[in-house]
Amino acid sequence: RRSFIEINAEFQKALHIMEETNRHVFITGKAGTGKSTLLEYFRHNTRKDVAVLAPTGVAALNVEGQTIHSFFGFKPSITPEKVKKISGPDAAIYKEFNTIIIDEISMVRADLLDCVEKFMRLNGPYRKQWFGGVQMVFVGDLYQL
């Protein structure tokens, strides 16, 4: 890992949108362009409550996060039709997050993203907003498959 970070104009703009707004963000770029550095910097310097997720166990380890399936309690066979409102002690946690970051977004199937959206709409703070009103930050290189 680099011990210093060059904060250029694009980096500052992305950080501003992530920190100061609730807008959904898609961060892309080739390998070595600073996506992981930006993610790490934001995570360690934000005032927001952030969850960092990835589609696979290895990708989750790389960002010190959890898998999407683990975080939402999804079984491997999850479909949007099977996503339900949850109750009990775990239910409140999904209302506490301001931002959910999903790294390696190019590896996330569209139907799994539909499950995440439905889950957050049912269990997040605002049922009538996309992803339950929680800011989503998608990070990845769509040319890397």
Regions found by a protein language model. Give the residues of each.
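Conserved ATP-binding/catalytic motifs of P-loop helicase motor domains
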Residues: 1-145
